[in-house]
Amino acid sequence: MKRVLIIDVLNMYLRSYIVVPSLSTNGQPIGGLVGTIKSLQKLARETKPDHIVFAWDGPNGSMKRKIMDKNYKEGRKPIRLNRAFHNLSEDEETQNKVWQQSRLMEYLNIMPVIQTILPEIEADDVISYITQMPYYKGWQKIIVSNDKDFMQLCDEETVLMRPVKKELLNKSRITEQTGVHPTNMALARAIIGDASDNLPGIKGAGFATVAKRLDFLSEEKTYTIDEVIEHCENSNSTLKFFSNVIEGRELVEHNYKMMQLYSPQMSIQAKTITKEAIENFEFTFNKTELIKMMNIDGFSDLNLSDLTAHMNRIAREN
């Protein structure tokens, strides 16, 4: 079975930016850049993919969901380095973060990897669309992200790799861990809410509670909000959970629209652009330019022999 890595690249980059302490030869932070490239090398070595796709959040990527909910993702703290660089002001640190991200795109551009970035579209929706593309039918799709949102996309061909947790999740393991089948994951999370996206849930509802009180969500059958409400209405239990879900129906419906990825929020045009970019991509690798860029950026001593070997293989086999 062929294999495609689908990487939530901003998730990976920001994690590296925060925790990787690498400095260039002139003393500037380059942890986001170096950490992401090293992560790519590790992933290529461990999974030996045939294709690699990096999905970026587009400019104003959250716009569609912010129109639906103005408080979406509000209250998030600014991303800052978790170590002190006394020579960088806050503005300089922000400029450095943006530069590293832009430079990372340039590095990826000289490798046989596909990058997608579309205005007003989040990477989550693009990743969902890619997993559903007929082009990749019969391939193993490995989504690389620490974001739990992608659990809902796992099926016979799609798995989720969460690097921080060091776990590879298929649909069976997700069901075992959470008590909820991926086909019902968005519904369960709509009840629970998502504090990281500023989406409050039903009071007193966590994964354990939802899995216990709505145990049918562990089935592969796709359940609806109507069926959940009906179950709660027919329950003889006096537990507040059931009445809270009934009273919070509008909140659950709203959260579901915000969270579900089964039907990605992409126009036909955006889907066509993504489809053509992937199907018509030319797989080339410029190792000489890679070495040149590493010298310029001050980390030429980094051993990327495994990465270059896999990039050569991908370019050759495609």
Predicted features along the sequence, with ranges:
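Noncatalytic, basic helical substrate-engagement surface that gates or grips nucleic-acid strands
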Residues: 2-142, 150-168, 260, 265-280
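Non-catalytic nucleic-acid-binding/docking modules located in mid-to-C-terminal regions
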Residues: 46-56, 71, 75-77, 112-113, ...
